[in-house]
């Protein structure tokens, strides 16, 4: 990481004149910059394989000089030495957990595919819309499992020149596709259900419906057990130095999401089983299209929340569990920080957040300390994965600028 405080007069359009920028720096800042640069060069090649490096550069902004640093790593500790060993251990453990999660999801996807085929056949044979609706819902979940597997694999792919953030939003686009397919299937089944209610002339094979629904309950229980026990129990990660975090359930986020899907399918299969019992013992065939309506409403409510999350991710909205005023207050409390503006928090993917901020400093002498403190605060207290901290001399005009502060009052 390299920090430089650059005066406006030192900025030039041509890159060959950038060497004049250091002449306007205080001596202590120049010395600190040189020492940090040399320490960066000492990072071992072994460590680089498991570490994204921060970098810094200066540029002009509204007539005053400033610098900023990017932090894309997953650990605040240096990769070299003892901290590097812990950091490498954390990444290896995360990789192994991802591999286990991928195998479990493939197993559940295979079970789902087998049962979906059986359920569509059984639903067609029994002339049951409720079973067809359940099969459609499970098809959506199968797509979700495949998307989760795709997301795990994409997470291992490196970023490219075109995709500088990597493939973090592949999961978001996949989820959007899954929801659209589910809505189309549900709409078709609702139209058929309306026709059956209006005409009230349809037969349902209650025995086939009962058997299919019973098998559906059994399949969902088996898939739930596979997801629950397939990835192991207690998991943990070690940070550099003295930090030690635990994830007691030891489950990948995609596996937890898949487990929620399966629980929803189990509830729906139980509902189909109840409808089959009603038809079997009372002969009231309207229970089938009515059950279809109820499941369609459930599908709508569950997918609307997913679509809302997708919308906010694509719009780069601040995640709902963050309060920008709390973040600003915490940064303002740092020693030497006179102002905080251009504060942004947004989602790169479903579970990865990025952050950027401008810090106006009382004195440039603590620039490096302020950057380090801000990065540590944001990553440890707020759990942000990608942080960009930009520092600049305090200017009352900038601090009171409505444009710079508009996100605070919006």
UniProtKB/Swiss-Prot annotation:
Swiss-Prot/TrEMBL keywords: Cell membrane, Cytoplasmic vesicle, Ion transport, Membrane, Transmembrane, Transmembrane helix, Transport, Zinc, Zinc transport
Residue ranges annotated as Extracellular topological domain: 125-129, 193-208, 280
Any GO MF annotation of the entry: zinc ion transmembrane transporter activity
UniProt cross-references to InterPro entries, sorted A to Z: Cation_efflux, Cation_efflux_CTD_sf, Cation_efflux_TMD_sf, CDF/SLC30A
Start-end of Basic residues biased regions: 50-69
Consequence of gene loss (knockout): RNAi-mediated knockdown causes hypersensitivity to low, chronic doses of the B.thuringiensis pore-forming toxin Cry5B and heavy metal Cd(2+) exposure.
Cytoplasmic side: 1-103, 151-171, 230-258, 302-410
Tissue specificity comment: Isoform a: Expressed in the hypodermis and the intestine. Isoform b: Expressed in the intestine, head neurons, seam cells, hypodermis, and the vulva.
Inducing factors: By B.thuringiensis pore-forming toxin Cry5B. Isoform a: Not induced by zinc. Isoform b: Induced by zinc specifically in intestinal cells.
Segments crossing the lipid bilayer: 104-124, 130-150, 172-192, 209-229, 259-279, 281-301
Pfam families noted in UniProt: Cation_efflux
Keyword set includes Zinc: yes
A GO BP entry: response to zinc ion
Region annotation Disordered: where it falls in the sequence: 1-94
Low complexity bias locations: 1-13, 35-46
A GO-annotated cellular component: cytoplasmic vesicle membrane
Function: Promotes excretion of zinc from intestinal cells into the intestinal lumen in response to increased dietary zinc. Involved in cadmium resistance, possibly by promoting its transport from cells. Involved in resistance to B.thuringiensis pore-forming toxin Cry5B downstream of the sek-1 and pmk-1 MAPK kinase pathway.
Entry-linked NCBIfam families: CDF (TIGR01297)
Family membership noted in the UniProt record: Belongs to the cation diffusion facilitator (CDF) transporter (TC 2.A.4) family. SLC30A subfamily.
Protein name: Zinc transporter ttm-1
Source organism: Caenorhabditis elegans
């Amino acid at each position: 990481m390299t920090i430089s405080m650059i005066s406006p007069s030192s900025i030039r359009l041509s890159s060959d004149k950038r060497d004049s920028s250091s002449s306007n720096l205080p001596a202590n800042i120049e010395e600190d910059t040189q020492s940090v640069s040399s320490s960066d060069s000492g990072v071992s090649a072994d460590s680089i394989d498991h570490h994204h490096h921060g970098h810094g550069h200066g540029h002009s902004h509204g007539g005053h000089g400033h610098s900023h640093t990017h932090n894309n790593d997953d650990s605040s500790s240096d990769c070299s030495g003892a901290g590097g060993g812990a950091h490498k251990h954390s990444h290896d453990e995360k990789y192994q957990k991802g591999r286990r999660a991928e195998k479990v999801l493939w197993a559940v996807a295979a079970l789902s595919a087998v049962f979906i085929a059986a359920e569509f056949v059984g639903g067609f044979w029994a002339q049951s819309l409720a079973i067809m609706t359940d099969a459609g819902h499970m098809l959506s979940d199968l797509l979700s499992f495949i998307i989760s597997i795709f997301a795990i694999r994409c997470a291992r792919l490196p970023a490219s020149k075109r995709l500088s953030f990597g493939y973090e939003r592949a999961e978001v686009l996949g989820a959007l596709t899954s929801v659209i397919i589910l809505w189309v299937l549900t709409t078709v089944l609702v139209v058929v259900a309306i026709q059956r209610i209006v005409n009230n002339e349809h037969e349902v094979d209650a025995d086939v419906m009962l058997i299919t629904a019973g098998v559906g309950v059994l399949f969902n229980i088996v898939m739930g057990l596979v997801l629950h026990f397939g990835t192991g129990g207690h998991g943990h990660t070690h940070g550099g130095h003295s930090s030690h975090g635990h994830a007691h359930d030891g489950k990948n986020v995609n596996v937890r999401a898949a487990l929620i899907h399966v629980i929803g399918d189990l509830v729906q299969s139980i509902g189909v089983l109840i409808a089959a019992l009603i038809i079997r013992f009372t002969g009231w065939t309207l229970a089938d299209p009515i059950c279809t309506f109820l499941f369609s409403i459930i599908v709508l409510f569950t997918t609307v929340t997913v679509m809302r999350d997708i919308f906010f991710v694509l719009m780069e909205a601040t995640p709902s569990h963050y309060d920008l005023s709390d973040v600003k207050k915490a940064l303002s409390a740092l020693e030497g920080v006179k102002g905080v503006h251009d504060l942004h928090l947004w989602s790169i993917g479903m579970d990865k957040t990025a952050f950027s901020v401008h810090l106006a400093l009382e004195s440039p002498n603590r620039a490096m300390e302020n950057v380090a403190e801000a990065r540590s605060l944001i990553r440890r207290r707020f759990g942000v994965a990608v942080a960009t901290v930009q520092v600049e001399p305090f200017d009352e005009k900038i601090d009171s600028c409505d444009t710079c502060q508009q996100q605070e009052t919006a």
